[in-house]
Amino acid sequence: MPRKLLGVLLAMIAFCAIVRAADDPFLGIWQLNGEKTSNYQQQSQMIINVPAPGGFTSYRATIGKDNQSSTETHPVAFDGKPYQTTGGDAREISYKRVDARTIERTQNRNGKISVDTEQVSEDGKTLTVKQANAVRVYEKQFDVKPAKR
């Protein structure tokens, strides 16, 4: 993993450790499980979800099949409004909470709309992202808990 990307990830882990968080099962650090993932064009991806007003902020660090890295950030707010991503994969994203463990994500990439479902398992250890022709499976590496005072 490139040093710069590793540095960003370590900084986010430290940040997560001190942040107060609600009991949202999506919060934490998620690592792509390539063996359980189907039809995904990237070599690896880590998702870091940290608390933010109205939902959370999602940071995504990706290593492509060509070993090139990219990062992308976007707010996850459940207000139905589209928000622009920053970084590698430019698009607008809006979110709808289906239930406590399921969210629906609508993406607009240059006028092309796609919808996927993200669901956290009952035990909170697996995040599954279902798209039209792909399934990505992530395993929780680090759980964000409220800071003790």
Task: Go through each PLM region and give its residues.
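Positively charged n-region of N-terminal signal peptides that target proteins for export
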Residues: 1-5
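Bacterial N-terminal signal peptides
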Residues: 7-17
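Hydrophobic small-molecule pocket/channel-lining residues, especially in calycin-type beta-barrels
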Residues: 21-149
